Swiss-Prot record:
Any Pfam family matching the protein: PilZ
Membrane is among the record's keywords: yes
GO cellular component terms attached to this protein's record: membrane
Record localization: Membrane
Protein's name according to its UniProt entry: Uncharacterized protein aq_1917
Keywords (A to Z) from UniProt: Membrane, Transmembrane, Transmembrane helix
Chief location bin: membrane
Length: 345
């Protein structure tokens, strides 16, 4: 009997062990898990909320540093927080700023669009120094000349005017252009690159006897680098020796007007017997480093009324000399960029 009782107890225990949970037990489990998840996740979400508040406070504090009004800062914050992870980039990075401007214009609120010019001026993005590439058609200077291509016809043109929404291009030749047509504008930015962009004509009107087309601004702007390396403007005294094919050497002095790791521009008063392909030796000092007998080749020359300028390609630049020039240009870029952001240029 005892054995039978023990067996019955074992069977009953097994049934209890393998039976499904009751509704009450399931509910209790859900409550316990929910409480556990809440306890674990609450600090995480709280920290995220505090982080968002901190980012927003820092953003508006930085906006006040640039004298933005509360309305201007609020409009900027509204769009920049959906554009980049670090909203403060809009105060430093012009490409980010132009993306935000695009979003404001696309939204089409006239009251917000009116604020862009004031914000742009306060952030010192109204114009670009020559060494910073264009990132939007808004960066193109008024009176910039170029070529407009419409229906495979090339027409000389220039930027007549611009605002935050539109670019106005005046045509220098008579040609019929209609709203809705696709056009391309090509232009050369001095000491920088060749640029082009495509657009759809929004409006056409006549001003002063010329046809003016209106296109929307775009950040889809193509850039073709003019040179392999950055060429930096300088004003340094230079002595040079021209090595003529007949063995004659011509010594002269002038001014180094720009330099890169690939070459330089040298200008001097008057004229000399020079032709493209002539070899030249340069002596000058850059960043406390003296370049002695730096060999180059004259690749082009421009003769003005009272002076001559030579484009020179370096032939035998040592690693040390290349490092000195490269470091000089990098430091000058940083200094000029800082001065630009501080409103000094």
């Amino acid at each position: 009997m005892e054995a039978q009782a023990g067996f019955d107890t074992f069977i009953e225990a097994t049934r209890y062990l393998f039976r499904g949970p009751s509704p009450q037990e399931i509910l209790l489990l859900i409550i316990v898990l929910g409480a556990l998840i809440t306890v674990v996740s609450l600090p995480f979400f709280y920290s995220k909320l505090k982080e968002k508040q901190r980012i927003r406070e820092n953003f508006f504090r930085r906006a006040r540093d640039f004298d933005l009004t509360e309305e201007e800062a609020s409009v900027l914050w509204k769009y920049v927080k959906e554009t980049v992870l670090n909203p403060n980039l809009v105060f430093e990075n012009k490409a980010v700023f132009e993306k935000v401007v695009d979003r404001i214009v696309q939204n089409g609120n006239p009251e917000e669009i009116k604020l862009i010019s004031s914000i742009r001026m306060k952030l010192r993005f109204s114009s670009l120094p020559w060494f910073i590439p264009l990132t939007s058609t808004r960066d193109i200077e008024v009176y910039q000349t170029g070529v407009l291509v419409v229906r495979n016809r090339r027409v000389d043109a220039y930027v007549y005017d611009k605002d935050e929404e539109f670019l106005y291009i005046a045509l220098l030749e008579p040609v019929v252009v209609k709203p809705g047509e696709r056009v391309s504008f090509f232009f050369l930015r001095e000491n920088d690159a060749r640029y082009s962009f495509d657009a759809t004509v929004e409006k056409v009107f006549n001003e002063g006897g010329r046809t003016v087309i209106v296109v929307r601004h775009t950040s889809e702007i193509k850039r073709i680098q003019l040179r392999e390396s950055v060429r930096w403007k300088v004003k340094l005294p230079v002595k040079f020796t021209l090595l003529k094919e007949n063995g004659e050497e011509i010594n002269a002095e002038g001014q180094l007007e720009d330099i890169s790791v690939k070459g330089a521009r040298v200008c001097f008063e008057g004229r000399l017997d020079i032709k493209e392909g002539d070899r030249i030796l340069l002596d000058f000092t850059l960043k406390n480093y003296t370049f002695k007998n730096l060999l180059g080749t004259v690749v082009h020359q421009i003769v003005y009324e009272k002076r001559t300028c030579l484009g020179i390609k370096f032939e035998e630049l040592s690693r040390k000399e290349e490092e000195v020039i490269g470091q000089f240009i990098l430091e000058e870029q940083r200094k000029l960029l800082k001065a630009y952001k501080e409103g000094e240029v």
